[in-house]
């Protein structure tokens, strides 16, 4: 059956855009929204606390009348103060945003730097769905990055960015609130897994950057489309593709595999393995605790404004509560390998399962709802972020790849 023509990756719901520096605003608009939202929540809490106090005073004989008068005066003064803060900060930051729009080059230098990228990635983790929905230029579009800059998804750009482009690729996908720089080891410590994959197996490392605040399902669907166009745009015919995802990155890669199977995409045919490092397949206890705290804060009038602040965290963060589901009927020809770690040196220590790597429990990192060629490994004495550059983690990945390689 003839395959239907697909939309280019710059169109449709799951758009893939190379130019991440377009839009109407940058940091000032995001700061304006944050300041005004926080001011509103503080005002609500102030009103709730003061209201309960005045309610009690107005029920006491002799002082009820004066209390009511003080309440009117208090409410008028407080209201004018918060209104001034709201409009004053809004006007100042709106003016700053107007200046930013007139200086695009300066804005690009900031967002293109490593520090700027780190800040932008953190903003996207917390509010990325809002940034994307509001068209804010700080929303990160999915793209490969080389030296901090996006690479357009066309053959000429890929050929220029990867002069040693071969037929074997490894796409590395970072986790929540990070960018491609997280894969780099510290000075004198750890291994560069991307370079090791290229040196030992000939897989050219491609580093993906994306908006971690979007829903995991949406990012997975975007990645599925992205990989399909990478397959057709790469300068050489791709013979082998592996995906390496850390934390949320592994979940998004899993979602992409599900979506690719449902849509009959081509890239899974050349994809040999998906490797997940510390990915919370069954959810993260940290986000479940966050949800419990949010619910508790909503239980009283005084703390409800704080609950609304907590509830404003991005959909991507909230999706980590339980992890993505999987369709057991989805055929998976791709080998999937999961690595979980514990802070304790002994993975069988009673605290090992409970602590996990500090963010993800051992069970959530190694258990899964997926069917097919699945294997997992447990390694002790490694924290969540150390999984990215730990030599023992790479050694396990290398063993799996050698086992899967044809004789």
Predicted feature descriptions by range:
Residues 2-188, 193-208, 218, 391-395, ...:
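Flexible, membrane-associating and regulatory peripheral segments of lipid-active enzymes
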Residues 40, 44-47, 51, 55, ...:
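Serine-dependent carboxylesterase/thioesterase catalytic core
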Residues 112, 119-120, 131, 258-407:
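Helical cap/lid subdomain of alpha/beta-hydrolase-fold lipid enzymes
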Residues 162-165, 199, 235, 268, ...:
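Short, flexible hinge/linker loops that cap or flank conserved catalytic cores
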Residues 166, 185, 238, 271, ...:
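A broad structural signal for short, well-ordered beta-strand segments within beta-sheet-rich domains
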Residues 166-168, 203, 237-240, 334:
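Short coil/turn segments at beta-strand junctions that form active-site/ligand-binding loops
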Residues 186, 211-215, 384:
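Short, contiguous acidic/charged loop-to-helix segments that flank catalytic cores in large enzymes
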Residues 203-210, 376-382:
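Short glycine/proline-rich turn/loop motifs
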């Amino acid at each position: 059956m003839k395959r239907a023509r697909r939309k280019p990756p710059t169109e449709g719901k799951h758009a893939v855009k190379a130019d991440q520096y377009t839009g109407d605003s940058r940091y000032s608009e995001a700061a304006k929204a944050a300041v005004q939202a926080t001011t509103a929540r503080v005002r609500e809490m102030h009103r709730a606390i003061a209201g309960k106090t005045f309610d009690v005073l107005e029920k006491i004989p002799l002082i009820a009348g004066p209390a009511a008068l003080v309440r009117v005066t208090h409410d008028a003064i407080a209201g004018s103060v918060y209104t001034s803060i709201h409009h004053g900060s809004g006007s100042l930051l709106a003016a700053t945003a107007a200046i930013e729009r007139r200086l695009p080059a300066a804005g690009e230098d900031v967002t293109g730097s490593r520090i700027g990228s780190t800040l932008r990635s953190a903003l996207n983790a917390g509010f990325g769905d809002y940034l994307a929905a509001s068209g804010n230029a700080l929303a990160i579009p999915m793209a490969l990055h080389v030296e901090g800059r996006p690479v357009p998804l066309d053959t000429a750009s890929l050929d220029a960015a990867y002069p040693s482009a071969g037929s074997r690729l490894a796409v590395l996908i970072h986790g929540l609130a990070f960018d491609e720089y997280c894969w780099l080891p510290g000075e004198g410590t750890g291994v560069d897994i991307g370079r090791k994959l290229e040196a030992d197996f000939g897989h050219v490392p491609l580093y993906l950057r994306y908006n971690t605040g979007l829903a995991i399902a949406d990012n997975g669907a975007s990645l599925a489309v992205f990989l399909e166009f990478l397959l057709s745009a790469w300068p050489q015919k791709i013979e082998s593709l592996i995906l390496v995802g850390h934390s949320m990155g592994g979940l998004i890669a899993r979602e992409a595999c599900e979506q690719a199977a449902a849509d009959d995409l081509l890239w899974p045919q050349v994809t040999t393995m998906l490797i997940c490092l510390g990915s919370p397949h069954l959810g993260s206890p940290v986000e479940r605790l966050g949800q419990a705290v949010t619910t508790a804060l909503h239980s009283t009038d005084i703390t409800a404004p704080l609950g609304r602040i907590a509830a404003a965290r991005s959909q991507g963060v909230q999706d980590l509560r339980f992890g993505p589901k999987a369709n057991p009927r989805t055929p998976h020809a791709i080998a999937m390998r999961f690595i979980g770690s514990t802070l304790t040196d002994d993975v069988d220590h009673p605290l090992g399962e409970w602590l996990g790597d500090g963010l993800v429990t051992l069970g959530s990192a190694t258990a899964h709802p997926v069917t097919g060629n699945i294997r997992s490994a447990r390694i002790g004495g490694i924290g969540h972020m150390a999984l990215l550059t730990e030599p023992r983690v790479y050694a396990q990945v290398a063993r799996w790849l050698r086992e899967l390689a044809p004789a």
